[in-house]
Amino acid sequence: MSERGLLIVLSGPSGVGKGTVRKAIFDSEENDFQYSISMTTRKQREGEVDGVDYYFRSREEFEAMIEAGEMLEYAEYVGNYYGTPLTYVNQTLDEGKDVFLEIEVQGAKQVKDKVPDGVFIFLTPPDLAELKSRIIGRGTDEMSVIEERMAVAREEIEMMALYDYAVVNDEVPLAVQRIKDIIASEHFRVDRVIGKYIKMLEEM
């Protein structure tokens, strides 16, 4: 049986560029991660594809999955649910493959409670002024929503201590390489590999 894969969790405040960084990681030739697509009740944006960017579901469908215990994590953010379906994640980890989650900060806390040996990475902006500029630059939100997102972002940055690593997204290629380096080093941690060597000794 193969070793269980790593659960890699990337999160950070709205507008920090989580989706852009994640897409750059998965577009690279040496990518070997499995992406767990999040589910949301928010409105589908122009250019987004159901089942590729998110699973877009109604509030009623999402709440039924919560009730059935079918979510690894979920959170309500600016009036919409976001979450991670459980079945795919467990099946993929059991196959020895690394699973990459891009989720909200509230959801990451739930995952850490359930999977404490995951790799938790917090993506940060260079500063809050840059973060606000990125959110405004999307052109998808009204000013009242932008201000609400900024207030939530401040609270989320204060939760950085819950994570294992902080990566500044000043330039996407640099942020991508930092994340890849973190994950590569995690595979060599003694507490992750020692079980294999103990088993080898027992079989000698």
Curated annotation (Swiss-Prot):
Q: Which reaction does it catalyse?
A: GMP + ATP = GDP + ADP
Question: Which compartment or compartments is the protein found in?
Answer: Cytoplasm
Q: Can you supply one Gene Ontology CC term for this chain's record? A: cytosol
User: Has the keyword Electron transport been applied to this entry?
Assistant: no
Please provide, alphabetically and separated by semicolons, the GO molecular function terms listed in this UniProt record. ATP binding; guanylate kinase activity
What PROSITE patterns does the database record attribute to this sequence? GUANYLATE_KINASE_1 (PS00856), GUANYLATE_KINASE_2 (PS50052)
Concerning Pfam families, the annotation shows: Guanylate_kin
**Does the keyword Nucleotide-binding belong to this entry?**
yes
Which residues hold ATP? G12, P13, S14, G15, V16, G17, K18, G19
Mainly resides where? cytoplasm
Domain spans labelled Guanylate kinase-like:
5-184
Q: Which UniProt keywords apply?
A: ATP-binding, Cytoplasm, Kinase, Nucleotide-binding, Transferase
What are the EC numbers? 2.7.4.8
Q: Which family does it belong to?
A: Belongs to the guanylate kinase family.
What is the annotated role of this protein in its UniProt record? Answer: Essential for recycling GMP and indirectly, cGMP.
Protein name per UniProt: Guanylate kinase
Q: What is the lineage of its organism?
A: Bacteria, Bacillati, Bacillota, Bacilli, Lactobacillales
